[in-house]
């Protein structure tokens, strides 16, 4: 679904995230966590059409990860 992700511009609470495409491909594939803000944006963006993609983000994502990028708080 790399092509689908590239067609959309994503915005987090701190602004546009250029590496989001690579981040999505990496996290969804490896099953790592995705910051809540990015996950929510993806959820709202694909809510109407790509329900399958939503499940992937929700299952692999978490809301406990800060936007600072630091996994350990």
Swiss-Prot record:
Cofactor (UniProt): Zn(2+)
Gene Ontology molecular function: aminopeptidase activity; dipeptidyl-peptidase activity; metallopeptidase activity
Reactions catalysed, as given in the entry: Release of an N-terminal dipeptide from a peptide comprising four or more residues, with broad specificity. Also acts on dipeptidyl 2-naphthylamides
Gene Ontology cellular-component terms listed: membrane
Enzyme Commission designation: 3.4.14.4
BP GO terms, sorted: proteolysis
UniProt keyword annotation of Manganese present: no
Topology of this chain in the membrane: Multi-pass membrane protein
UniProt pH dependence: Optimum pH is 5.1.
Subcellular location per the Swiss-Prot or TrEMBL entry: Membrane
Cofactor remark: Binds 1 zinc ion per subunit.
Broad class of the protein's primary localization: membrane
Alphabetical keyword list: Aminopeptidase, Hydrolase, Membrane, Metalloprotease, Protease, Transmembrane, Zinc
Source species, domain of life: Eukaryota
Family affiliation: Belongs to the peptidase M49 family.
Physiological role: Degrades neuropeptide proctolin (RYLPT) by cleavage between Tyr and Leu residues.
Miscellaneous section: Purified protein is present in 2 isoforms; 76 kDa and 80 kDa.
Protein name: Dipeptidyl peptidase 3
Organism: Blaberus craniifer (Death's head cockroach)
Taxonomic lineage: Eukaryota, Metazoa, Ecdysozoa, Arthropoda, Hexapoda
